[in-house]
A protein has these predicted regions:
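Conserved lysine of the Walker
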Residues: 35
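Hydrophobic anchor at the beta1->P-loop junction of P-loop NTPases
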Residues: 25-27
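N-terminal pre-Walker A segment at the start of P-loop NTPase domains
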Residues: 1-14
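Short beta-strand-centered segment that lines the nucleotide-binding/catalytic pocket of NTP-utilizing
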Residues: 48-64
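The conserved Walker
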Residues: 31
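Short phosphate-coordinating micro-motif centered on Lys-Gly-acidic
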Residues: 80-141
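Phosphate-binding P-loop
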Residues: 16-22
Length: 141
Protein backbone atom coordinates (compact mmCIF):
# COMPACT_ATOMS: atom_id res chain seq x y z
CA UNK A 1 0.00 0.00 0.00
CA UNK A 2 1.34 3.43 -0.94
CA UNK A 3 0.14 6.62 0.71
CA UNK A 4 1.30 9.23 -1.84
CA UNK A 5 1.96 9.56 -5.56
CA UNK A 6 5.71 9.77 -4.85
CA UNK A 7 5.61 6.34 -3.17
CA UNK A 8 3.77 4.82 -6.14
CA UNK A 9 6.40 6.32 -8.44
CA UNK A 10 9.19 4.95 -6.23
CA UNK A 11 7.80 1.42 -6.63
CA UNK A 12 8.14 1.82 -10.39
CA UNK A 13 11.72 3.10 -10.06
CA UNK A 14 12.73 0.17 -7.88
CA UNK A 15 11.16 -2.31 -10.29
CA UNK A 16 12.81 -0.93 -13.43
CA UNK A 17 16.24 -0.40 -11.87
CA UNK A 18 16.96 -4.10 -12.45
CA UNK A 19 15.55 -4.29 -15.97
CA UNK A 20 17.94 -5.45 -18.72
CA UNK A 21 15.71 -4.92 -21.77
CA UNK A 22 12.74 -6.74 -23.25
CA UNK A 23 10.47 -6.41 -20.21
CA UNK A 24 6.80 -5.50 -20.56
CA UNK A 25 4.84 -3.84 -17.74
CA UNK A 26 1.06 -4.13 -18.01
CA UNK A 27 -0.82 -1.69 -15.79
CA UNK A 28 -4.40 -2.26 -14.65
CA UNK A 29 -6.54 0.08 -12.57
CA UNK A 30 -9.35 2.61 -12.60
CA UNK A 31 -8.87 6.28 -13.44
CA UNK A 32 -6.75 8.04 -10.85
CA UNK A 33 -5.14 4.97 -9.30
CA UNK A 34 -1.58 6.05 -10.16
CA UNK A 35 -0.76 4.20 -13.37
CA UNK A 36 1.05 7.19 -14.91
CA UNK A 37 2.85 7.92 -11.62
CA UNK A 38 4.10 4.33 -11.64
CA UNK A 39 5.34 4.76 -15.24
CA UNK A 40 7.16 7.96 -14.20
CA UNK A 41 8.97 5.83 -11.67
CA UNK A 42 9.82 3.27 -14.34
CA UNK A 43 11.36 6.12 -16.35
CA UNK A 44 13.41 7.26 -13.38
CA UNK A 45 14.75 3.74 -12.85
CA UNK A 46 15.72 3.62 -16.53
CA UNK A 47 17.48 7.00 -16.31
CA UNK A 48 14.94 8.58 -18.66
CA UNK A 49 13.35 11.97 -17.92
CA UNK A 50 10.37 11.19 -15.64
CA UNK A 51 8.94 14.72 -15.90
CA UNK A 52 8.41 14.11 -19.64
CA UNK A 53 6.20 11.11 -18.91
CA UNK A 54 2.57 12.13 -19.11
CA UNK A 55 -0.52 10.12 -19.82
CA UNK A 56 -0.29 9.71 -23.60
CA UNK A 57 -4.06 9.25 -24.00
CA UNK A 58 -4.21 11.35 -27.13
CA UNK A 59 -0.91 10.22 -28.65
CA UNK A 60 -1.39 6.55 -27.60
CA UNK A 61 2.35 5.76 -27.67
CA UNK A 62 5.43 7.76 -26.67
CA UNK A 63 9.08 6.75 -26.31
CA UNK A 64 11.59 8.07 -23.77
CA UNK A 65 15.33 7.38 -24.24
CA UNK A 66 17.39 6.39 -21.22
CA UNK A 67 19.57 3.47 -20.14
CA UNK A 68 16.87 1.51 -21.97
CA UNK A 69 14.17 3.16 -24.10
CA UNK A 70 10.83 3.31 -22.30
CA UNK A 71 7.90 2.87 -24.71
CA UNK A 72 4.75 4.11 -22.95
CA UNK A 73 1.32 3.18 -24.36
CA UNK A 74 -2.04 4.33 -23.01
CA UNK A 75 -4.96 2.33 -24.39
CA UNK A 76 -7.71 4.27 -22.58
CA UNK A 77 -9.31 5.53 -25.81
CA UNK A 78 -9.29 2.13 -27.51
CA UNK A 79 -12.44 0.05 -27.63
CA UNK A 80 -10.68 -3.25 -27.03
CA UNK A 81 -11.87 -4.94 -30.23
CA UNK A 82 -8.43 -5.49 -31.76
CA UNK A 83 -7.66 -1.85 -32.57
CA UNK A 84 -4.55 -2.12 -30.37
CA UNK A 85 -2.98 -4.34 -33.05
CA UNK A 86 -2.64 -1.31 -35.35
CA UNK A 87 -0.22 0.33 -32.87
CA UNK A 88 2.46 -2.29 -33.50
CA UNK A 89 2.95 -2.98 -29.79
CA UNK A 90 3.81 -6.61 -30.55
CA UNK A 91 7.06 -5.38 -32.13
CA UNK A 92 8.06 -3.64 -28.90
CA UNK A 93 9.95 -3.36 -26.61
CA UNK A 94 12.95 -4.92 -28.38
CA UNK A 95 16.15 -5.96 -26.60
CA UNK A 96 17.10 -2.36 -25.67
CA UNK A 97 13.68 -1.24 -24.52
CA UNK A 98 10.90 -1.62 -21.97
CA UNK A 99 7.20 -1.38 -22.81
CA UNK A 100 4.69 -0.01 -20.27
CA UNK A 101 1.00 -0.33 -21.21
CA UNK A 102 -1.68 1.55 -19.27
CA UNK A 103 -5.22 0.15 -19.51
CA UNK A 104 -3.72 -3.23 -20.43
CA UNK A 105 -7.11 -4.92 -20.10
CA UNK A 106 -7.85 -3.45 -23.55
CA UNK A 107 -5.13 -5.52 -25.22
CA UNK A 108 -6.57 -8.12 -27.56
CA UNK A 109 -3.77 -10.53 -26.62
CA UNK A 110 -0.52 -10.64 -24.61
CA UNK A 111 2.23 -11.95 -26.94
CA UNK A 112 5.23 -11.18 -24.69
CA UNK A 113 7.16 -13.66 -22.58
CA UNK A 114 8.60 -11.40 -19.83
CA UNK A 115 5.62 -9.60 -18.31
CA UNK A 116 5.04 -7.72 -15.06
CA UNK A 117 1.36 -7.22 -14.23
CA UNK A 118 0.82 -4.19 -12.01
CA UNK A 119 -2.64 -3.79 -10.47
CA UNK A 120 -3.46 -0.51 -8.74
CA UNK A 121 -6.58 0.08 -6.64
CA UNK A 122 -7.94 2.95 -4.57
CA UNK A 123 -7.50 2.19 -0.85
CA UNK A 124 -9.08 5.34 0.61
CA UNK A 125 -7.80 8.92 0.45
CA UNK A 126 -4.43 9.10 -1.30
CA UNK A 127 -3.66 5.47 -0.49
CA UNK A 128 -3.24 2.92 -3.27
CA UNK A 129 -3.03 -0.84 -3.08
CA UNK A 130 -0.39 -2.03 -5.58
CA UNK A 131 0.10 -5.65 -6.60
CA UNK A 132 2.95 -6.72 -8.87
CA UNK A 133 3.18 -10.17 -10.43
CA UNK A 134 6.00 -11.31 -12.73
CA UNK A 135 5.58 -14.08 -15.23
CA UNK A 136 8.13 -15.30 -17.73
CA UNK A 137 6.91 -17.91 -20.19
CA UNK A 138 6.86 -18.67 -23.87
CA UNK A 139 4.89 -16.10 -25.92
CA UNK A 140 1.28 -17.06 -26.48
CA UNK A 141 1.41 -19.76 -23.78
Amino acid sequence: VTSAEAETSELGARLSAGFRGGEVVLLFGELGTGKTAFVRGLARGLLAEPEEVTSPSFVLLTSHPGRLTLHHADLYRLRGDGDDLELGLEELPGPRGVLAVEWAERLSRVPWSDVYEVRLEHAGGDRRRVGIEHRAEAPGA
